[in-house]
């Protein structure tokens, strides 16, 4: 019918996305365990940062601030493979964002801001944090932890007098994370570059195995390119410059194994400092606007539905949708939604007896540190399995600041997360670029 034909091109992206979202292969992908490397050192750094951050308020007689300090210490999750100078800049920036977020949302809660307005503020934060993470390429966990900080700021019934102590605790935690995660520069400043070359070699070997998936070659080329970026950064610093030629020659050999036409470039590594500002400028024209819009829209809807439904922590719903949308494709969003939803429900059941147990402050702190360390060793292998430790850890951290009914806390976490995951997938279906398709054009295959 003529009246309906104009709507068909507009619905084409939705139909294509629906075909992609409903692909049964996503369920198999959600069950698959991925290979991972170099996770132990990063896990130990994160565990040490969280342990120190929790211990300081506990020893100072302010256990109620331990949760905010440990949140600040979660900046240690970022930049784990970056060269030390970039890692320091990234951790300082993320730590500032975390501290400011906790302060701002504590202030909103203390001022008695209506729930729907705070929900809108959390969604706006999620969108802004997503844009930041995409532009400066923070990598996992992306904007999720920053949104978690907003939920922590809103938790409890804070007064204006709580704003400063909470922010100070978060800043101290972030500072400890910065010190722990950059301490290696004093002993072996070239360690990130050596690790990058080793990871590139491992990726190339994986791509050359018989029966390797087609995407393994692309992953190997990405690892080689990443290693070259790290070497270029090292070449611009006097403390690491001397080791660059040998590492570049090693990387050339790795690349030639992947591509016989590779040209040796060991003596011509450019000295390029990898600054956050330069990275953001180089990616400003890239595809960051659509993911940002999806995160903002999904966060607003998920948080509003949770608030209207009377769920106890509406910000967790926004965090759930944000986590689902931190990837680059519909496939990633669906797999992440399945893993996060199922993993959180199971994790909430595991958290219930831990929350009800009389662990005391130091017992709870010890469990949080162990769970955090274990999480970082498995999260890159299987996100759903990691949720079995992430969920109890997050709820125990919450209980450090605000003891609550264990069953209510666990139920809120499960419901809010599942709601957020569902809304995140809906955002993939419904939020698309505004494009005009001529009547003669045929939509391309789903991506």
Where in this protein do the model-derived segments appear?
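Cytosolic regulatory and coupling regions of membrane transport/channel systems
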Residues: 1-51, 55, 59, 63, ...
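Pore- and pathway-forming membrane helices of multi-pass small-molecule/ion transporters and channels
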Residues: 18-27, 44-54, 58, 62-84, ...
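Short, amphipathic, aromatic/basic-enriched membrane-interface segments that mark the entry/exit
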Residues: 30-42, 60-61, 83-92, 111-114, ...
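Hydrophobic transmembrane alpha-helices and their membrane-interface boundaries in multi-pass
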Residues: 86-106, 347-350
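Alpha-helical membrane-embedding segments
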Residues: 100-111, 131-134, 153-161, 179-187, ...
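A compact, surface-exposed functional segment
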Residues: 196-205, 361-381, 437-438
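A cross-kingdom feature marking solvent-exposed beta-strand/loop segments within repeated
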Residues: 236-242, 329-330, 356, 372
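Core alpha-helical transmembrane segments of integral membrane proteins
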Residues: 285-358
């Amino acid at each position: 019918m003529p009246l309906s034909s104009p709507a068909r091109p507009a619905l084409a992206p939705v139909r294509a996305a629906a075909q992609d979202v409903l692909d049964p292969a996503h369920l198999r992908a959600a069950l698959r365990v991925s290979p991972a490397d170099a996770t132990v050192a990063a896990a130990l750094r994160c565990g040490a940062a969280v342990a120190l951050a929790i211990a300081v308020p506990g020893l100072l007689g302010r256990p109620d601030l331990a949760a905010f300090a440990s949140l600040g210490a979660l900046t240690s999750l970022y930049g784990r493979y970056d060269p030390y100078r970039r890692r320091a800049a990234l951790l300082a920036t993320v730590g500032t964002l975390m501290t400011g977020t906790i302060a701002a949302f504590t202030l909103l809660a203390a001022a008695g801001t209506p729930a729907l307005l705070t929900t809108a503020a959390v969604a706006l934060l999620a969108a802004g944090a997503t844009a930041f993470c995409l532009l400066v390429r923070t990598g996992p966990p992306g904007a999720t932890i920053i949104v978690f900080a907003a939920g922590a700021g809103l938790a409890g019934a804070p007064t204006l007098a709580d704003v400063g102590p909470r922010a100070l605790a978060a800043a101290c935690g972030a500072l400890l994370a910065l010190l722990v995660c950059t301490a290696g520069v004093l002993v072996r400043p070239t360690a990130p570059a050596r690790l990058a070359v080793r990871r590139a070699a491992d990726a190339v070997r994986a791509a050359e195995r018989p029966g390797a998936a087609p995407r393994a070659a692309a992953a190997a080329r990405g690892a080689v390119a990443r290693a070259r970026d790290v070497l270029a950064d090292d070449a611009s610093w006097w403390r690491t410059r001397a080791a660059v030629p040998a590492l570049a020659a090693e990387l050339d050999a790795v690349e030639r194994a992947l591509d016989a036409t590779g040209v040796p470039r060991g003596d011509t590594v450019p000295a390029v400092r990898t600054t956050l500002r330069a990275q953001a400028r180089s990616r400003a024209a890239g595809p960051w606007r659509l993911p940002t819009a999806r995160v903002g829209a999904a966060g607003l809807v998920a948080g509003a539905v949770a608030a209207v439904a009377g769920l106890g922590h509406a910000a967790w719903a926004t965090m759930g949708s944000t986590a689902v949308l931190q990837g680059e494709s519909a496939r990633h969003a669906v797999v992440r939604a399945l893993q996060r939803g199922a993993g959180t429900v199971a994790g909430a059941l595991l958290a219930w007896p831990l929350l009800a147990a009389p662990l005391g402050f130091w017992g709870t702190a010890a469990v949080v540190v162990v769970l955090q360390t274990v999480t970082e060793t498995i999260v890159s292998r299987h996100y759903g399995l990691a949720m079995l430790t992430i969920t109890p850890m997050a709820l125990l951290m919450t209980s450090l600041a605000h003891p609550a009914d264990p069953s209510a806390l666990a139920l809120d976490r499960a419901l809010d997360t599942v709601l957020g995951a569902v809304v995140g997938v809906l955002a993939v279906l419904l939020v698309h670029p505004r494009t005009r398709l001529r009547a003669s054009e045929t939509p391309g295959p789903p991506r």
